[in-house]
């Protein structure tokens, strides 16, 4: 279960960074924004790994014997992408009004990486539903907090959160590959 908690934390770093950005740009009605951001990000961070998990089960017979290498490569790619985006300054756009459509788009965009990471969940031999709940709930809490961090001048934390998330995903990939 420790692996799932670490994975949940790492996957939530994209949503945390975006939530900080939402808080920086929108200082009005923070409680509602934090709740909506947490719900959107939490639901999609739980849904996408489930889709990846189902895909992993479907592909298992074709890649048996290589599944640890595939999981490592996927987590390495996701982690590397997160680290790259942390250093790429032109990724963010100005968002003046946060609508449900914008939150939905951001939730999908930040959770696509989680779909690939979901493939590795079958390697942990844990209850998938509990794992997805932990991922979703962790993302909800971290996103909720991120809005408040951003509203209090959190510009300095955005890229650090993505770097940390990327490094943790790469380390999880190494653990899967080596143990």
Curated annotation (Swiss-Prot):
Topological category with respect to the lipid bilayer: Multi-pass membrane protein
A Gene Ontology term for the protein's cellular component: plasma membrane
UniProt keyword annotations, A-Z: Cell inner membrane, Cell membrane, Ion transport, Manganese, Membrane, Transmembrane, Transmembrane helix, Transport
TM region positions: 4-24, 39-59, 69-89, 102-122, 128-148, 159-179
Location(s) in or outside the cell: Cell inner membrane
InterPro entries named in the record: Mntp/YtaF, Put_MntP
GO molecular function terms listed in the Swiss-Prot or TrEMBL record: manganese ion transmembrane transporter activity
Classification via Pfam families: Mntp (PF02659)
Family in the record: Belongs to the MntP (TC 9.B.29) family.
Function: Probably functions as a manganese efflux pump.
Name of protein: Putative manganese efflux pump MntP
Source organism of the structure: Aliarcobacter butzleri (strain RM4018)
Gene of this entry: mntP
């Amino acid at each position: 279960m420790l692996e799932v908690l670490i994975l949940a934390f790492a996957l939530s770093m994209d949503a945390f960074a975006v939530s900080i950005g939402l808080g920086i740009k929108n200082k009005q009605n923070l409680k509602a924004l934090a709740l909506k951001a947490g719900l959107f990000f939490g639901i999609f961070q739980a849904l996408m790994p489930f889709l990846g998990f189902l895909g992993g089960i479907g592909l298992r017979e074709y890649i048996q014997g290589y599944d640890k290498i595939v999981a490592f490569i996927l987590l390495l790619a996701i982690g590397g992408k997160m680290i790259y985006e942390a250093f790429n300054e032109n990724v963010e756009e100005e968002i003046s009004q946060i609508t449900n459509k914008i939150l939905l788009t951001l939730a999908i965009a930040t959770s696509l990486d989680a779909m690939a990471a979901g493939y590795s969940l079958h390697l942990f031999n844990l209850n998938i539903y509990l794992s997805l709940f932990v991922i979703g709930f962790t993302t909800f809490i971290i996103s909720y907090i991120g809005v408040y961090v951003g509203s209090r001048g959190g510009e300095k934390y955005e890229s650090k959160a993505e770097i940390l998330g990327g490094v943790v995903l790469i380390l999880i990939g190494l653990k899967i590959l080596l143990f």
